[in-house]
From Swiss-Prot:
Protein's name in the database: Putative glycerol-3-phosphate transporter 3
Family: Belongs to the major facilitator superfamily. Organophosphate:Pi antiporter (OPA) (TC 2.A.1.4) family.
ATP-binding among keywords: no
Organism, as annotated: Arabidopsis thaliana
GO biological process, one term: phosphate ion homeostasis
PANTHER family given in the database record: GLYCEROL-3-PHOSPHATE TRANSPORTER 3-RELATED, MAJOR FACILITATOR SUPERFAMILY TRANSPORTER 16, ISOFORM B
Transmembrane segments: 31-51, 91-111, 123-143, 158-178, 185-205, 217-237, 279-299, 331-351, 355-375, 378-398, 436-456, 459-479
């Protein structure tokens, strides 16, 4: 078995059985490179939609499980479910969120390390099916009349591990097929899976809630289990696994430099037969830009996941235009935050490509998050129209940088020039960045569970402070990118060029 610093691959690549099936019905046999790219885009997209859909039931059923939520609940949806129906119900729900997200954060680092060494298709399938089983087991408590707090805690802990497998895998696979030049826009569109998953999960959970809260979990569970099987049958991990040949016209200057995992992976196979080196965990932290973006995402994801887990609950506790909304209506209304997130992710990717500045774009969105949150808290209750507009704007600025950092930025850093094209780092770097962010994601919701009992104003001040710190962490990178825009090539490019003759690449085994 590979150690923490081992660089051995633990698998032999094989063509997915579904690809064999498709090739039998094609006159020319093999699929084209672009067809494989389309397949990868769609499969990874729907896979992570399913992952996020399974996270939404928790936030949707909070008001149903807790009979005595924060504030004076006046809606029609009551009932409660022990042990969450007491005065400390919101705190217990926050602890369950903490258990899930803590294991998710730790598991992300482990999953990323394994993702560069295991068959990504099989590993991703395990994560999806395991997530489906855990999500269903949470809902089974409704029919089995289970009220033990530690049952829910154990299920969410296990679910956190299986969920952590997904992100490093899908980003690594996508990075294997798309070059750096177009990552911003492509991954900006692709990152819509986060918000779409939240929307779909919300609609499924709220639609089934009237039949009993257990169904809110079973629906998304069946979805991700089915899609996990589809992924196993059809997902091509990289061009070599399916013997795909890139058209000469598609190779651009960026790819000739060996920036992408695909090129370095294929070239290494040509020269050595089978390159088994993968970047080590500590070495990945040394890649320029990884640490600042990782800690930036800590605070960015804290804000995003607080909304993910608590927005429907907050809306149900707030009179909008003098009217108290039901749990179902609150859940459906909260999807507008995710609609804004879809637009924000696409805009962030587009602007970052046009400016060639990931940090500038992320920082700009993050700083605009602060007034957006302030306005939503102060004026969101005035009327339904104002609430919708401000919720959309808040979602745009909150999820825009989150989507950019976890996709295009992670893929760029995972194929950084300092690696000199001789190491596999995509899954590891992705895991470091999103794993660090997930620590913040674990802290935000549980803090909200306690702070909301005091005041929702305090919750929003906490979120605005987190956004400010997040933006400040990118200051150095923003300054470097501004200098590059004003004066030409960056200092980093000169350093990398000099390093090619003066020092060896990053030690991939550290």
């Amino acid at each position: 078995m590979a150690s923490w610093t081992s660089s051995e691959f633990l698998y032999e690549e094989v063509k997915p059985p579904g690809i064999h099936f498709l090739e039998r019905f094609r006159r020319s046999g093999k699929l084209s490179f672009k067809q494989y790219q389309a397949m990868v885009f769609v499969l990874t997209f729907i896979a992570y939609i399913a992952f996020h859909a399974t996270r939404k039931p928790n936030s949707i059923v909070k008001g149903t499980l807790s009979e005595q939520p924060t504030g004076h609940f006046k809606g029609a949806d009551k009932g409660g479910w022990a042990p969450f129906d007491g005065p400390d119900g919101t705190a217990l729900l926050g602890q369950i969120d903490l258990a899930f997200l803590s294991v998710y954060a730790v598991g992300m680092f482990v999953a990323g390390h394994l993702g560069d060494r295991l068959d990504l298709r099989t590993f991703l399938t395990i994560g999806m099916v395991g997530t489906g089983v855990c999500t269903a087991l949470f809902g089974v408590a409704f029919w089995a009349n289970i009220h033990a707090f530690y049952y829910f805690l154990a299920i969410q802990t296990l679910a956190g591990w299986f969920q952590s497998i997904g992100w490093p895998c899908v980003v690594a696979v996508l990075g294997n097929w798309f070059d750096k030049k177009r990552r911003g826009v492509i991954m900006g569109v692709w990152s819509a899976h986060t918000s779409l998953g939240n929307i779909i999960g919300t609609l499924i959970a709220t639609g089934l809630l009237k039949f009993g809260w257990g169904w809110s979990f079973v629906g998304p569970a069946l979805l991700i289990t089915f899609l996990g099987i589809v992924v196993y049958l059809f997902l091509p991990v990289n061009p070599h696994a399916v013997e795909a040949e890139r058209d000469g016209s598609e190779v651009d200057s960026t790819m000739r430099l060996g920036d992408t995992i695909t090129e370095s992976f294929l070239s290494s196979r040509t020269s050595t037969g089978f390159d088994r080196r993968a970047v080590g965990f500590l070495a990945a932290w040394k890649i320029p830009g990884v640490a600042p973006f990782a800690f930036c995402l800590f605070f960015t994801k804290l804000v995003s996941y607080t909304f993910l887990y608590w927005l429907p609950f907050y809306v149900s506790q707030t009179e909008i235009g003098g009217e108290q909304l039901s749990q179902e209506t609150s859940g459906n209304l909260s999807t507008l935050f995710d609609v804004g997130g879809v637009v924000g992710g696409i805009l962030a990717g587009y602007f970052s490509d046009q400016l060639d500045g990931r940090a500038i774009t992320a920082g700009g969105f993050i700083y605009l998050t602060i007034p957006a949150l302030f306005l939503y808290r102060i004026y969101g209750h005035v009327s339904m129209t104002i609430n919708i507009i401000l919720m959309f704007v808040a979602g745009l600025f909150v999820n825009g940088p989150y989507a950019l950092i976890t996709t295009a930025v992670a893929a760029d850093l995972g194929t950084h020039k300092s690696l000199k094209g001789n190491a596999r780092a995509l899954a590891t770097v992705t895991a470091i960045i999103d794993g660090t962010g997930s620590v913040g994601a674990a802290i935000g919701p549980v803090l909200t569970g306690y702070i909301a009992a005091i005041s929702w104003d305090a919750v929003f001040y906490m979120l605005m402070t987190a956004a400010l710190i997040s933006g400040l962490l990118l200051t150095t990178l923003i300054i470097e990118e501004v200098k590059t825009l004003l004066y030409g090539s960056s200092e980093e490019d000169h350093e990398v060029a000099a390093a090619s003759t003066s020092r060896p690449p990053i030690d991939v085994l550290i």
